[in-house]
């Protein structure tokens, strides 16, 4: 569960972003396309794809494919990008089982056609580490229940709902393959339905933040850690979009700190905590070059 200060910050940033999004509809689409390689790279890398960000850009942007890559990984990049683009061009009003199956079919086409677009059934058990997915006999029913619960719950805080959905989806593990990528894709679709930007779960921090949050849910049936992670990533995503839509010049946080006589480690810590409007691009912290805010004294660190 996140505190009220964090909720207020998200609400304020969300309101600002939605106003900008109405004014800059075409820019929003272009920003999403520009962020596509990082979204695809990180989501696939979490599943142990060996493609680098540069490889992913070559495949998606330049249509260049090196011969030393496995064909499966090339399709994984292209198919995930296709699924994201489908959602961009075909906005949905609510999550449905039919949408989930369509996205899965897109994701696994030419990779595992025999299971693409259908839930596990019969004797199709699945294990991830020590976790065993739900009994295949009950997967279909569990998924309809999960979708119905998400769509009908109008009282719970939206990030709590999204985090619970994601954690339970991964706990059920409804597919024979592609569960993590579909789960993260659905999280961003749920945010988009609320007029919010996509989040990027960094591959580099999966062992420190993402996996422990999922493990907590498996052990306690509570998704608080995942809510906190999603809140942090959403704030960063809002900073990214708002800054790109409004800033005259965007520079590395390292340069910003130097220009303002601020200790670099102090500035970096503030960026990580989200107390300055910084965001990552290709793993590097960036910020509006003209940003100044007396509310946060960076020198106190």
Q: Where do the protein language model's features map onto the residues?
A:
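FIC/Doc superfamily catalytic core
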Residues: 1-177, 181-301
